[in-house]
């Protein structure tokens, strides 16, 4: 996992040499990790650099069942990160949209249209400074 977090395109043979396994063993382990949902290998992009001019985190307060609201939010393609949480908000949802009009439309016409949504607070991203996915393993 550490080897692939450093470079998701690293050859299995190279990983095998670094960790003392054969290429076939590395391939099988990676396949098992992917199939079990432990790991994904994806290209991570900066949305602002690939045509999406607006990203924001939406804090959502809910009356009632937060998981039911999260189920409805999951279906929205603009939401790329969604967590049910404790604290000031019941749910945090990250959205990536083409522009401010699109962001406003998603918030007003879709998120706030969910009956259990009591209120929202929008945190518009101005600049992506750090984004990592290298938590390592235990």
Task: Label the model's feature ranges.
Residues 1-138:
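A compositional/biophysical signature of low hydrophobicity enriched in polar/charged and small residues
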């Amino acid at each position: 996992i550490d080897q692939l977090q450093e470079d998701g395109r690293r050859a299995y043979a190279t990983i095998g040499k670094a960790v003392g396994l054969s290429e076939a063993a590395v391939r099988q382990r990676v396949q098992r990790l992917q199939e079990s949902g432990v790991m994904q290998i994806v290209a991570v992009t900066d949305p602002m650099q690939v045509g999406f001019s607006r990203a924001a985190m939406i804090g959502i307060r809910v009356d009632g069942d937060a998981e039911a609201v999260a189920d409805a939010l999951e279906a929205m393609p603009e939401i790329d990160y969604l967590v049910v949480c404790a604290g000031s908000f019941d749910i945090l949802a990250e959205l990536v949209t083409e522009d401010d009009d699109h962001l406003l439309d998603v918030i007003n016409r879709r998120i706030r249209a969910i009956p259990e949504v009591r209120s929202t607070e929008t945190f518009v991203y101005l600049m992506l400074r750090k984004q990592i996915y290298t938590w390592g393993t235990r």
